[in-house]
């Protein structure tokens, strides 16, 4: 039996489908991801969560003419399936196979290759600036996970994008997780935003009334309307960080409702200036094991898709990570001044054991390696003995 997915070799093929066929395609993509990753392993959790978003982006935008920039690539497996790499997908992360991340040399649809989180906004702004310098008209979209919003680089990009007033779209994929649960004020702010469509409707009505009343009451009504609009924003969306940075905000939107996603992206595509679409997704969507243990299923080796168990059970000695975590926890019992610091990876660094036993002495600062190291330095000046556990490749951003 021919599947919808097997007929799609490019975004043009996807656009030939009717909208009512897209949910069926989404299920086929999830089945394909679960099947292939059970053999190759991979970052399946986030990719399962953005299946509908991937479909909607390719359905409403014109990649590779429009530039879609995915942050990191952990989210981009469905993107690969829909952009001509379905047949190659069983070679994911294998020697001679396709990359587990986005790779410009692999596809014209992979606009930017990166291993660090937080780069998409700045890269997208660079592309939008280049477009304007060359007098071109295409759209530029940055897809950023809420985990990357714990990254200072994301805000450097957003700050410059809002100030530039360039035509650029930021899509926030909000699943409440990066690798481990997100931390910090930004994560809490996203969690407080109210999903109420009355916000944008009311703001548009205020603008309409302003123009109608200007002729009667003069320019003073414009200032009054602006104050009312500001109050509306704060009432429905506490904080409104994005609007303060110069972005027009839309959302939150159910990231698994294809009709709503397509309608919203089509509407936002027709606008200009910096704008942000806040999309709520579930990490591991459609795979019960990944839904129930999102941290474990962020990325893992081969597994049995029926039981969720690893295909190869280790019967050997403990790993270096396990030894490190156990040793650090043992030392903490003897040294009350010892604390642990990590950057969004307690499980990956082995410090989750320390976290469970000494939560008040454990600090997960999110995807903020530079802050982690400097924060640890501040602790050390006051007689505390911090152990800062970060993957070596991520530590590159904190050398200074």
Q: What is each PLM-predicted segment?
A:
Residues 43-164, 320, 338, 342-343, ...:
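Cofactor-binding active-site loop characterized by glycine-rich and histidine/acidic residues
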Residues 175-324:
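Long, well-ordered, tryptophan-enriched scaffold segments
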Residues 119-144, 148-195, 204, 232-238, ...:
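Hydrophobic, small-residue-rich alpha-helical packing segments that form membrane-like cores
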Residues 87-102, 163-180, 198-201, 363:
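A glycine-rich helix N-cap at a beta->alpha junction
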Residues 72-77, 144-151, 172-178, 283, ...:
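Acidic, glycine-rich active-site loops and adjacent beta-strand->loop/helix elements
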Residues 78-84, 149-158, 179-186, 190-191, ...:
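Short acidic, glycine/serine/threonine-rich loops at helix termini
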Residues 1-83, 241-281:
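N-terminal amphipathic, basic-rich helices that act as targeting or association modules
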């Amino acid at each position: 039996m021919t599947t919808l997915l097997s007929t799609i070799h490019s975004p043009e093929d996807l656009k030939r489908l009717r909208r009512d066929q897209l949910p069926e395609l989404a299920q086929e993509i999830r089945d394909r991801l679960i099947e292939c990753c059970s053999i190759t392993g991979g970052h399946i959790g986030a990719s399962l969560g953005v299946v509908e978003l991937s479909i909607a982006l390719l359905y409403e935008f014109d990649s590779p003419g429009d530039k879609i920039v995915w942050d990191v690539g952990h989210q981009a497996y469905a993107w690969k399936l829909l952009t001509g790499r379905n047949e190659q997908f069983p070679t994911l992360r294998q020697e001679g196979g396709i990359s587990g991340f986005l790779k410009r040399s692999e596809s014209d649809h992979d606009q930017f290759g990166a291993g660090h989180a937080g780069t998409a906004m700045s890269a997208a702004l660079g592309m939008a600036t280049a477009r304007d310098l060359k007098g071109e008209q295409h759209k530029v979209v940055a897809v950023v996970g809420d985990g990357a919003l714990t990254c200072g680089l994301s805000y450097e990009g957003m700050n410059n994008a809002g100030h530039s007033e360039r035509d650029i779209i930021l899509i926030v994929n909000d699943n409440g997780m990066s690798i481990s649960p997100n931390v910090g004020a930004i994560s809490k702010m996203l969690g407080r935003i109210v999903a109420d469509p009355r916000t944008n409707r009311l703001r548009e009505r205020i603008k309409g009334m302003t123009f109608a009343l200007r002729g009667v009451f003069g320019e003073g009504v414009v200032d009054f309307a602006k104050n009312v609009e500001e109050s509306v924003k704060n009432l429905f969306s506490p904080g409104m960080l994005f609007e303060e940075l110069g972005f027009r905000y839309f959302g939150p939107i159910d990231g698994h409702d294809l009709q709503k996603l397509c309608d919203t992206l089509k509407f936002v595509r027709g606008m200009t200036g910096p704008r942000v679409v806040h999309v709520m997704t579930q990490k591991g969507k459609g795979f019960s094991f990944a839904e129930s243990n999102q941290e474990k299923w962020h990325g893992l080796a081969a597994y049995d898709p029926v039981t969720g168990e690893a295909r190869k059970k280790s019967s050997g000695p403990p790993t270096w990570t396990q030894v490190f975590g156990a040793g650090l926890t043992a030392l903490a019992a003897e040294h009350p001044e010892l604390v642990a610091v990590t950057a969004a990876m307690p499980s990956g660094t082995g410090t989750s054991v320390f976290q469970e036993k000494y939560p008040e002495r454990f600090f997960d600062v999110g995807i903020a390696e530079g802050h982690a190291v400097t924060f640890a330095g501040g602790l050390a000046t006051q007689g505390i003995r911090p152990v800062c556990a970060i993957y070596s490749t991520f530590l590159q951003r904190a050398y200074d």
